[in-house]
Regions:
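A solvent-exposed, acidic/Ser-Thr-rich amphipathic alpha-helical stretch
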Residues: 28-29, 46-117, 131-132
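Sec-dependent N-terminal signal peptides
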Residues: 4-14
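Short, low-complexity N-terminal intrinsically disordered segments enriched in polar/charged residues
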Residues: 2, 17-55, 166-168
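Sequence/structural signature of outer-membrane beta-barrel proteins
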Residues: 60, 121-125, 159-162
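Short aromatic-enriched loop/helix-cap "lid" or pocket-rim segments at secondary-structure transitions
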Residues: 63-64, 162-166
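Short beta-strand edge/turn micro-motifs at domain boundaries
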Residues: 132-161
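Short beta-strand segments enriched in hydrophobic/aromatic residues
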Residues: 53, 118-120, 154-157
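Extended, well-structured beta-strand/loop surface patches
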Residues: 112, 125-126, 136
Length: 168
């Protein structure tokens, strides 16, 4: 009996360490996923965006309201942000404000919160890009069947740009 107990204990230690990630690894992974998502957002690549969003996502925007499914969120994105090729919104995180907070259970990461501030720029055909405004964000990423997806999205404290300034 004791050899089986010892074997089971050793096996559980190895299994836990094999599946657990360090905070640094989780932070790097979430920053990478976040970067891919926002690159897709900036290019209106809705297929890539959709692949990083949970089916049961809840998105809360302090000016635009709430949407509570991936299908609803993507329909709004397609209609409001990606329907006019002569108008694009570009999102950029404010350097130094973005932080990732791993969420763990029994030492294994099951999620992470990424939070910070971001800027939004408008690109219109024939015009220079200009700053439209800024806001804060908090996103909950969850590990869902082996895949990291955004599950809860909060975009809040939106402010219009203090002055319209073209980006060089």
């Amino acid at each position: 009996m004791y050899p089986k107990l010892i074997f089971a204990t050793i096996l559980s230690i190895f299994a836990t360490s094999a599946f657990s990630q360090s905070d640094h690894e989780v932070q790097a992974l979430i920053l990478e996923k976040d970067s891919i998502f926002w690159k897709a957002y900036n290019n209106c690549d809705v297929d890539v965006m959709e692949s990083y969003i949970a089916e049961d996502v809840e998105f809360y925007h302090d000016l635009g309201g709430a949407s509570k499914t991936r299908d609803t969120m993507m329909a709004i994105t397609k209609k409001n942000l990606c329907s006019n090729p002569d108008f694009r919104l570009r999102r950029e995180a404010v350097p130094g404000t973005v932080k990732v907070f791993p969420m763990k259970k029994n030492g294994a990461a099951y999620g992470a919160i990424i939070a910070g501030e971001h800027l939004f720029y408008i690109n219109q055909a024939g015009k220079k890009e200009f700053l439209d405004g800024d806001a804060s964000f908090s996103h909950l990423w969850l590990l869902n069947n082996g895949k990291w997806v955004m599950s809860r999205i909060f975009s809040y404290d939106h402010h219009a740009a203090k002055q319209t300034s073209a980006v060089k």
